[in-house]
Amino acid sequence: MGTLSVNQNKLQKRLRRLAGEAVTDFNMIEEGDKVMVCLSGGKDSYTMLDVLLYLQKVAPIGFEIVAVNMDQKQPGFPEEVLPTYLKSIGVDYHIIEKDTYSVVKEKIPEGKTTCSLCSRLRRGTLYTFADRIGATKMALGHHRDDILETFFLNLFYGGTLKAMPPKLLSDDGRNVVIRPLAYCSETDIEAYAKLKEFPIIPCNLCGSQENLQRQVVKEMLREWERQSPGRTEIMFRALQNVHPSQLADRKLFDFAGLRIDDSAAPRFVDAVNL
């Protein structure tokens, strides 16, 4: 890749800045961390690795990066692509070989979406491997749009107000998961992946289509952004500005314990009489 144009340079700086802000805001990476970067071969994980390698060079703390890919034995998976790329940029890496593809095909009827089960099997394997190599953080490539899509999926179909947190502790308590691209837009990531000419591996090798509900939500958000540019950013800010007293979850706010403050009236009268 040659010299960047002005716009390309702005794009690169924006992604690096936003990832750096997310890492700082949520204390994602600390001195001495061993960060296991989960690399699928898609645009998001390539971009995440690229940005984290930059942050590793300029950060005031020292941390280690190791890339990990899981070869799930999908037919046609190009086994040589990731090792070749990672060797070319000098990054330590591991390839986990585990045939979850056969398990998924056995459990899920033909024509049904396999993504959910496939994801759970992959996540469990990665958690175990992170523990084995002593990784203190496990980095996933989810971005701002993924987080918002998950929020609306849970809202529309699950009846819950939750999304993907930028940082979380796994259910088994053994792994801290981080999402350094939490502030980055999918549009920027797509443009950056093309600019950097990452060797993208198709995500549909298994023949499964993305969850239909997620596709609907993704298109809904894109249409909203087309109609009202900046709306996506505003919605994401809402996830960082929650007021439990203005919702209806009794576990988060003590509605039953609300009482009139008897001292409020005298204070109000005193203020008026001043």
Swiss-Prot record:
Its cofactor is Mg(2+); [4Fe-4S] cluster. It is an enzyme of class 2 (transferase). GO terms for molecular function: 4 iron, 4 sulfur cluster binding; ATP binding; magnesium ion binding; sulfurtransferase activity; tRNA binding. It comes from the Bacteria. A motif (PP-loop motif) lies at residues 40-45. One of its GO terms (cellular component) is cytoplasm. Binds 1 [4Fe-4S] cluster per subunit. The cluster is chelated by three Cys residues, the fourth Fe has a free coordination site that may bind a sulfur atom transferred from the persulfide of IscS. It is found in: Cytoplasm. [4Fe-4S] cluster binds at residues 115, 118, 206. Its main location: cytoplasm. Keywords: 4Fe-4S, ATP-binding, Cytoplasm, Iron, Iron-sulfur, Magnesium, Metal-binding, Nucleotide-binding, RNA-binding, Transferase, tRNA processing, tRNA-binding. SUPFAM superfamilies: Adenine nucleotide alpha hydrolases-like. Pathway: tRNA modification. PANTHER family: AMINOTRAN_5 DOMAIN-CONTAINING PROTEIN (PTHR43686:SF1), SULFURTRANSFERASE-RELATED (PTHR43686). Belongs to the TtcA family. Catalyzes the ATP-dependent 2-thiolation of cytidine in position 32 of tRNA, to form 2-thiocytidine (s(2)C32). The sulfur atoms are provided by the cysteine/cysteine desulfurase (IscS) system. The thiolation reaction likely consists of two steps: a first activation step by ATP to form an adenylated intermediate of the target base of tRNA, and a second nucleophilic substitution step of the sulfur (S) atom supplied by the hydrosulfide attached to the Fe-S cluster. This is tRNA-cytidine(32) 2-sulfurtransferase. It comes from Azotobacter vinelandii (strain DJ / ATCC BAA-1303). The gene is ttcA.
